[in-house]
Design a protein with these regions (language model features):
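PP2C/PPM-type serine/threonine phosphatase catalytic domain
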Residues: 1-171
């Protein structure tokens, strides 16, 4: 899937239609041994277990602000208002032959009732992890959870998109 995405981006660059086009990537691949998750950029993947009110996995942003936070140069609160908070340090760019590699993780501990949440950074602009857990732990239908997430992001200035994957059964 990643090779195909790079191939299509490169075709756009060759055709001259790229206009410095770049994108993030988030990918979940479910298989008999669990799930393989991969990402490039600042779109995020979460694996949540509402039954224990736990985030089991949260992808690491490939962004300047996150790198500075990890290095101890910014606090968590300073990250939110840092002027260059939207600078991405790894992305898929049309015509960029270096083809940055994604972070890849295998997740085998998947249980019925778990959720995977894939979202762009705009979905998280005003939402903390604890609030996200509260939404997914709420005793309401998935459609209502979706509406709760939409209402939390209605004032966001960044683009926002998301996918919710609810694990019903595991074989």
């Amino acid at each position: 899937a990643l090779a195909y995405a790079y191939e299509e981006l490169d075709k756009l660059a060759i055709a001259g239609d790229s206009r410095q086009m770049g994108t993030t990537l988030t990918l979940l691949y479910f298989h008999s041994n669990g799930c393989t998750a991969a990402h490039i950029g600042d779109s995020r993947i979460y694996h949540l277990r509402p039954s224990s009110h736990t985030i089991l996995y949260k992808s690491r942003d490939h962004s300047l602000v996150y790198d500075l936070y990890q290095a101890g140069e910014l606090t968590y609160e300073e990250m939110k208002t840092f002027p260059q908070k939207n600078v991405i340090t790894r992305a898929m760019i049309a015509g960029d032959r270096s083809h940055p590699k994604p972070d890849v993780i295998h997740i085998s501990d998947i249980q019925p009732g778990d959720y995977f949440y894939i979202c762009s950074d705009g979905m998280l602009e005003q939402m903390e992890d604890e609030e996200l857990l509260d939404v997914f732990s709420a005793n309401v239908r998935d459609e209502e959870k979706r509406q709760m997430l939409i209402s939390e992001t209605s004032d966001n200035k960044d683009n926002h998109s998301a996918y919710i994957v609810h694990i019903k059964e595991v074989s």
